[in-house]
C-alpha cells in the first residue's frame, strides 16, 4: 500500500546514512597520473604488471550511493508527478513516513492508504522497492565472485532461522505490492492488507526481528561475546569476508525494519519506535568500522604472517608462483595499500639504517626456497611520476642477481622503480640516489647490479584538516594521505556533513492529533475500525433514519441539523476523493470554497455544543449520545450485548467526528502549503497547530463529559449483562440482572442514579455462589464384592467451598456379586474359605477339609491305588510279576518280566481282574504311605503284588535285575527310609518328560521308576526286567534311546 511503501522509501533515506561506513569510505588527495606507465623489458628481473584489484570498499560504496540516489530520484519523480496534478498527498515534505503512517490511522478520511494512492504511484513505489532490494542482492553476488572460498551459510549458521523469516516476509510484501498495483478496487486492496497482516503475525516476524537484534547486539551469557563480534573474529582481517558479513547482516536488519514499518502502516498503528532499529544498524556499522580500522593499523604485522603462511603452504611451487600468490593475497586483504614484492640476494649494507626506509621491510631466508623478500607499500591512490622521485619518503636499494634469474619483482603501476625510471632517462633519479647517504658509495660500486623502488608520495598537508565537520572522528590510514571519518550516530556523509533529522510540519500535527484522540478515549489500536473503512456520514444518516420518530432526538437534530450537514459535507467530499470519484484538484477547490464560507472555529464549536449539550437550551445528560442510548435501551434490554454493540458503534462514530473533520482540513492545508510563499506558509502552519490544539482539547472534553454522564462500567464476573462498558450507561437506566451457570444475581435489579452530582449504580451487584445439582451416581468401584460409588456437585461461585455450605461429594456402599467364583479364578470351599483356582487338585489340602482334593474332583494317583504300567518301547507289553499258589510257601521271590495279558494300549475293567499279575498296589511315602494321599512326581513309592492275603510280594530291583520279594511281612505295612531296612524296594517316581516336575501323577502320564542303582527297564516279551542308568545319568536329549525305561501309568 501507499503508506507502507512510502514508509519503506523514507526508511532508505533514514537508514542508508548508516552505510556511510559500510564498508568505510577512504578519501585521498590524488594528483594527476598518466593512465599507464610503460615499463622496459628486462632480462635480469621478472616484473609482471600487477593490476590493482577493484576494492570491495569502493565497490560497495558505489552501489550504496546508487541505491540512495534511486530513492532520492523516486521521491523527485513523485514530486514531479504531483506538480503536474496540481497537488497530491505525497507532496507533503520529505518526511513521508510520519505523514502517511499517521494519515492511515483513521478511516474517516483515509482508511488504508491504497485508497488515496493511484495505481501509477504504487507502480513507482513497487518498482523502486524491488529495485533497491535487487541492488542489495547484487552486492552479495559481487562479494561471492570476489571470494568464492567464504562459506557464508556456515559462518552465519545462527542467523539462518531469522534470515529466512525476514526473507519470506519480504517476498510476501513484494507480492502484496505487485497485486495492489494491478488491483483498483479499494475493498480488495484492504483484503490484501489484511492477508499480509495475518502472515506477519502468524509467522511472528516482529518477534524474530527483535530476537535477531538481541542476538547481534547483546553479549552472550556463555561466551561473554556478541554474535556479530564473533563473526568478525572468524573473518580476521580478510576485508572481503568482513564486508560480506557486514553487508549480509545489515541487509537482514534493513529488510526486517521494512517489514515492521509495512505491518504498522497496513494495520494503521502508530509507526514503531525507529530508535531501536537505527541503533542496531549504528551498532553493527561501528563494530565493522572499528574492526576494519584495527586491520589497517596492524596491516604490516598481519602481512608478515601472511607471507610466511603462503610460502609454507606453496613450498612445491616455483618462486615466481609464490610471489604472485603473495602479491595477490596482500592486495586482496589489504586493498588500501599498493604492494611491491621483490626477491633479492641481499639489501645494501646500510639500507636498514636509512631514514628512507619507513615503508618497507625485509624477510630473510623465508621458506624452502631460502629467498630474501623485500616488501614495499604505499597508499593505493598515491601516484607520481619519475620527476617527483625526490618527494618519496622511502627508497629501497637492492642487490640483484644479474643473470641467474633468481631475482623477481612484482610492482604496481603507481610505484616508481628502476625499470620505470632508468638513470639514463631521468638524471634527477641518479642525482637523488647519489645524494643519499650513507649508501651512496655502495650504489656507485654496484651500479649495474642494484635495483631500487621508491614509495610514499603523500600530498602535503593534513588529510584530516576538515575535522569531519565537527560531527565525527577523523583517522588517517598509516603511511597514506587517506582518511576515514567515524560519524557520530545522527550524522552521515563522506565527511559527516549531513544531519539526520525529520521535518516537523503538518504531518507531525496529524500525529499529535491521533495521539490526542487515543489518549482521550484510551484506545490502544484502531485496526478494526480501519479495516472496516466505514463511511461515517452514511452511518450517521442510518442512525437518524432509524430514530427520527423519537421526539427528544428529533429536537436535538433539528437544532444542530445545519452544523451536522456541514460536517457531512466535509466527510462526503473526503470520501469521494478517497474513492477516486473526484480528482485532487476538485477536492482542493471544494474544500477551499467551503472553508471560505464556514469558519473552522464555528463548525467545531457547534459540533461541541451538540455533543456536550452546551447550547442555549440544552440540558446536561440530554445530549445527542445520551438521548440515543435511551432510544436503544427502550427497544432492547439494557446492558445486554446487543445494546452494548449498538451503543459502542455510535460512540466510536461520534468520538471520531472531530478527529475526522480535523484530519480532512489538515489534509487540505498540506495540499495548499506546496503553493504558498514562506509568509503564508507560516500563517497556515500556525492555523494548523491551533486546529490540532483545539481538537485535542475538545476530544478530552467529550471523554470527560461522557464519563460524567455515565455510571461506572458494569464489570461483574459471571454477570450476563456485558453491554454497559465505559461511557455506555446513562442516568435513570434500569437493569435487570442475571448470572450464568446457575448463579444467583444479588440484587436482581439496579439503576443508574445521581448521588450528590455523581452517577453511580444503586447497588453493587454480585453473583452469589450456590450448589449445582448432584451428578449421577458413579459406577461401583469394583466388578465384584463390596465397593463404593459416589456423586458430586459444584459450587457455582468465585471462591468455591468458602461460599457453599455442605459437602461437595457423597459416597455409598454397593455390591455387585460374589468375587469367589470360577470366572474370577477362585474356588469357594464348603467352609467358605476362598482359594485360587490354580490350587485345586494340586495335591495340597488348601480347604482344610480335603474338598479341593477329593477323588471325585481330582483324578490323580494316590497312595493305595492299583496301577498298571505299559512299557513305551514295547507298547503292547506290560510290567508283570509271577506268583501262584503252587509256589512253595517258603519261596520268597517271584519273577518280574514283560507280558501282554492286557491286550490294548489301556486297561479294561475286566482286565484288572483277569490280568492280576500285571497290576500292582502303590504306596507313597507321604505320612509313611497313608492311604488316599496324593503321589507327586519326585516322591518315593513302593509297589507290591497280592494274590491272597497270605500271598504277596514287594517289587524290588537288586542288584541289576528286578523281581518280587518279601521285605515287609504284610501288605500295606511298608516303612520308608533307613529304619525300614528295605531301601531296594523304594523307587522315585519321575516325570519322564520333565524331571523337575512336582505335580501330582495323573493317569496316562509317562514315568520313570528309579532308585540309587538306576531306572527300571523292560527288555521285551517274557524277558526279565532289569535296571540300568538310562534317563538317570543321561541328558534330556537322550530320552528316545531310553524308551524302554519309560512307562505309561494307568490307575484303576
From Swiss-Prot:
GO terms for cellular component: extracellular region. InterPro entries: EGF-like_dom, LDL_receptor-like_sf, LDLR_class-A_CS, LDrepeatLR_classA_rpt, SE-CTX-like, Sushi_SCR_CCP_dom, TSP1_rpt, TSP1_rpt_sf. Residues 1-21 form the signal peptide. PROSITE patterns: EGF_1, EGF_3, LDLRA_1, LDLRA_2, SUSHI, TSP1. One of its GO terms (molecular function) is toxin activity. Keywords: Coiled coil, Disulfide bond, EGF-like domain, Glycoprotein, Secreted, Signal, Sushi, Toxin. Glycans are attached at residues 41, 353, 576, 715, 786. Disulfide bonds join 464-474, 468-485, 487-496, 711-752, 739-767, 780-814, 784-820, 795-804, 829-847, 841-858. Residues 22-29 form a propeptide. Residues 709-769 form the Sushi domain. Residues 819-859 form the LDL-receptor class A domain. Pfam families: TSP_1. Residues 460-497 form the EGF-like domain. PANTHER family: RAPUNZEL 5, RICIN B-TYPE LECTIN DOMAIN-CONTAINING PROTEIN. This is SE-cephalotoxin. It comes from Acanthosepion esculentum (Golden cuttlefish). The lineage of its organism: Eukaryota, Metazoa, Spiralia, Lophotrochozoa, Mollusca.
Amino acid at each position: 500500500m501507499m503508506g507502507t511503501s512510502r514508509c519503506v522509501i523514507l526508511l532508505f533515506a533514514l537508514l542508508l546514512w548508516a552505510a556511510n561506513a559500510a564498508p568505510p569510505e577512504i578519501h585521498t588527495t590524488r594528483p594527476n597520473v598518466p593512465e599507464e606507465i610503460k615499463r622496459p623489458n628486462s632480462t635480469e628481473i621478472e616484473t609482471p604488471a600487477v593490476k590493482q584489484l577493484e576494492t570491495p570498499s569502493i565497490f560497495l560504496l558505489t552501489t550504496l550511493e546508487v541505491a540512495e540516489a534511486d530513492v532520492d530520484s523516486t521521491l523527485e519523480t513523485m514530486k514531479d508527478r504531483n506538480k503536474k496534478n496540481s497537488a497530491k498527498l505525497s507532496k507533503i515534505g520529505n518526511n513521508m513516513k510520519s505523514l502517511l503512517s499517521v494519515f492511515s490511522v483513521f478511516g474517516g478520511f483515509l482508511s488504508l492508504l491504497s485508497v488515496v494512492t493511484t495505481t501509477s504511484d504504487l507502480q513507482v513505489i513497487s518498482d523502486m522497492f524491488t529495485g533497491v532490494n535487487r541492488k542489495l542482492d547484487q552486492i552479495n553476488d559481487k562479494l561471492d565472485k570476489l571470494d568464492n572460498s567464504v562459506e557464508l551459510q556456515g559462518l552465519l549458521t545462527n542467523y539462518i532461522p531469522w534470515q529466512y523469516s525476514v526473507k519470506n516476509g519480504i517476498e510476501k510484501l513484494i507480492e502484496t505490492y505487485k497485486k495492489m498495483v494491478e488491483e483498483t478496487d479499494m475493498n480488495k486492496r484492504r483484503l490484501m492488507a489484511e492477508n499480509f497482516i495475518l502472515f506477519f503475525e502468524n509467522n511472528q516476524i516482529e518477534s524474530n526481528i527483535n530476537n535477531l537484534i538481541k542476538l547481534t547486539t547483546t553479549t552472550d551469557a556463555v561466551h561473554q561475546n556478541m554474535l556479530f563480534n564473533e563473526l568478525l573474529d572468524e573473518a580476521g582481517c580478510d576485508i572481503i569476508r568482513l564486508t560480506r558479513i557486514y553487508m549480509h547482516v545489515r541487509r537482514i536488519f534493513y529488510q526486517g525494519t521494512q517489514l515492521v514499518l509495512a505491518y504498522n502502516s497496513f494495520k494503521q498503528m502508530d509507526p514503531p519506535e525507529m530508535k531501536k532499529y537505527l541503533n542496531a544498524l549504528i551498532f553493527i556499522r561501528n563494530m565493522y568500522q572499528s574492526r576494519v580500522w584495527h586491520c589497517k593499523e596492524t596491516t604490516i604485522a598481519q602481512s608478515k604472517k601472511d607471507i610466511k603462511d603462503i610460502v609454507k603452504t606453496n613450498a612445491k611451487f616455483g618462486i615466481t608462483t609464490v610471489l604472485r600468490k603473495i602479491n595477490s593475497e596482500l592486495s586482496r586483504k589489504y586493498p588500501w595499500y599498493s604492494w611491491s614484492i621483490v626477491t633479492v640476494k641481499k639489501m645494501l649494507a646500510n639500507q636498514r639504517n636509512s631514514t628512507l626506509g619507513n615503508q618497507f621491510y625485509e624477510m630473510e631466508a623465508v621458506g624452502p626456497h631460502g629467498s630474501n623478500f623485500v616488501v614495499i607499500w604505499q597508499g593505493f591512490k598515491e601516484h607520481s611520476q619519475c620527476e617527483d622521485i625526490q618527494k618519496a619518503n622511502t627508497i629501497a636499494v637492492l642487490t640483484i642477481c644479474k643473470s641467474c634469474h633468481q631475482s623477481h619483482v612484482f610492482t604496481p603501476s603507481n610505484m616508481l622503480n628502476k625499470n620505470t625510471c632508468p638513470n639514463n632517462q631521468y638524471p634527477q633519479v641518479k642525482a637523488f640516489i647519489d645524494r643519499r647517504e650513507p649508501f651512496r658509495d655502495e650504489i656507485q660500486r654496484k651500479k649495474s647490479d642494484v635495483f631500487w623502488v621508491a614509495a610514499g608520495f603523500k600530498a602535503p598537508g593534513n588529510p584530516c584538516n576538515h575535522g569531519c565537520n565537527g560531527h565525527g572522528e577523523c583517522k588517517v590510514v598509516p603511511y597514506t594521505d587517506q582518511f576515514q571519518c567515524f560519524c557520530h550516530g545522527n550524522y552521515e556523509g563522506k565527511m559527516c556533513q549531513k544531519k539526520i533529522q525529520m521535518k516537523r510540519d503538518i504531518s507531525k500535527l496529524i500525529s499529535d492529533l491521533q495521539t490526542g484522540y487515543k489518549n482521550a478515549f484510551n484506545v490502544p489500536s484502531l485496526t478494526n475500525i480501519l479495516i472496516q473503512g466505514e463511511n461515517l456520514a452514511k452511518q450517521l444518516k442510518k442512525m437518524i433514519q432509524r430514530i427520527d420518530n423519537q421526539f427528544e432526538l428529533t429536537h436535538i437534530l433539528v437544532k444542530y441539523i445545519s452544523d451536522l450537514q456541514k460536517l457531512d459535507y466535509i466527510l462526503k467530499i473526503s470520501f469521494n476523493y478517497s474513492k477516486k470519484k473526484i480528482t485532487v484538484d476538485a477536492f482542493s477547490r471544494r474544500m477551499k470554497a467551503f472553508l471560505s464560507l464556514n469558519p473552522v472555529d464555528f463548525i467545531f464549536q457547534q459540533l461541541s455544543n451538540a455533543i456536550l449539550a452546551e447550547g442555549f437550551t440544552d440540558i446536561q445528560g440530554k445530549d445527542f449520545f445520551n438521548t440515543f442510548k435511551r432510544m436503544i435501551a427502550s427497544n432492547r434490554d439494557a446492558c445486554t450485548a446487543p445494546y452494548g454493540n449498538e451503543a459502542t458503534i455510535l460512540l466510536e462514530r461520534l468520538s471520531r467526528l472531530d478527529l475526522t473533520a480535523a484530519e480532512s482540513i489538515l489534509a487540505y492545508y498540506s495540499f495548499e502549503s506546496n503553493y504558498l510563499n514562506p509568509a503564508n506558509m507560516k500563517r497556515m502552519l500556525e492555523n494548523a497547530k491551533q486546529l490540532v490544539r483545539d481538537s485535542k482539547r475538545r476530544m478530552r472534553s467529550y471523554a470527560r463529559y461522557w464519563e460524567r454522564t455515565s455510571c461506572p462500567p458494569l464489570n461483574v464476573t459471571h454477570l450476563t449483562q456485558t453491554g454497559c462498558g465505559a461511557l455506555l450507561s446513562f442516568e435513570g437506566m434500569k437493569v435487570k440482572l442475571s448470572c450464568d451457570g446457575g448463579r444467583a444475581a444479588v440484587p436482581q435489579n439496579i439503576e443508574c442514579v445521581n448521588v450528590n452530582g455523581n452517577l453511580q449504580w444503586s447497588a453493587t451487584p454480585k453473583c452469589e455462589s450456590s450448589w449445582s445439582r448432584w451428578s449421577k451416581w458413579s459406577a461401583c468401584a469394583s466388578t465384584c464384592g463390596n465397593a463404593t460409588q459416589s456423586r458430586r456437585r459444584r459450587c457455582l461461585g468465585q471462591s468455591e467451598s468458602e461460599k457453599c455450605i455442605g459437602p461437595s461429594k457423597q459416597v455409598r456402599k454397593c455390591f455387585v456379586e460374589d468375587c469367589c467364583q470360577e470366572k474370577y479364578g477362585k474356588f469357594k470351599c464348603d467352609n467358605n474359605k476362598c482359594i485360587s483356582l490354580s490350587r485345586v487338585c494340586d495335591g495340597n489340602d488348601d480347604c482344610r477339609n480335603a474338598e479341593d482334593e477329593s477323588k471325585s474332583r481330582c483324578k490323580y494317583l494316590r497312595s493305595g491305588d492299583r496301577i498298571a504300567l505299559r512299557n513305551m518301547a514295547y507298547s503292547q507289553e506290560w510290567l508283570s510279576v509271577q506268583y501262584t499258589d503252587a509256589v512253595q510257601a517258603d519261596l520268597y521271590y517271584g519273577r518280574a518280566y514283560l507280558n501282554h495279558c492286557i491286550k490294548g494300549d489301556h486297561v479294561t475293567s475286566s482286565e484288572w481282574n483277569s490280568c492280576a499279575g500285571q497290576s500292582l498296589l502303590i504306596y507313597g511315602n507321604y505320612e509313611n504311605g497313608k492311604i488316599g494321599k496324593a503321589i507327586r512326581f519326585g516322591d518315593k513309592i513302593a509297589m507290591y503284588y497280592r494274590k491272597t492275603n497270605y500271598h504277596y510280594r514287594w517289587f524290588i530291583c537288586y542288584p541289576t535285575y528286578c523281581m518280587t520279594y518279601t521285605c515287609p511281612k504284610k501288605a500295606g505295612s511298608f516303612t520308608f527310609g533307613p529304619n525300614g531296612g528295605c531301601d531296594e524296594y523304594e523307587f522315585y517316581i519321575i516325570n519322564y518328560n520333565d524331571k523337575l516336575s512336582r505335580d501330582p501323577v495323573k493317569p496316562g502320564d509317562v514315568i520313570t521308576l528309579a532308585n540309587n542303582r538306576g531306572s527300571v527297564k523292560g527288555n521285551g516279551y517274557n524277558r526279565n526286567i532289569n535296571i540300568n542308568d538310562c534317563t538317570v545319568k543321561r541328558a534330556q536329549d537322550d530320552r528316545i534311546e531310553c524308551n524302554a525305561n519309560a512307562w505309561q501309568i494307568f490307575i484303576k
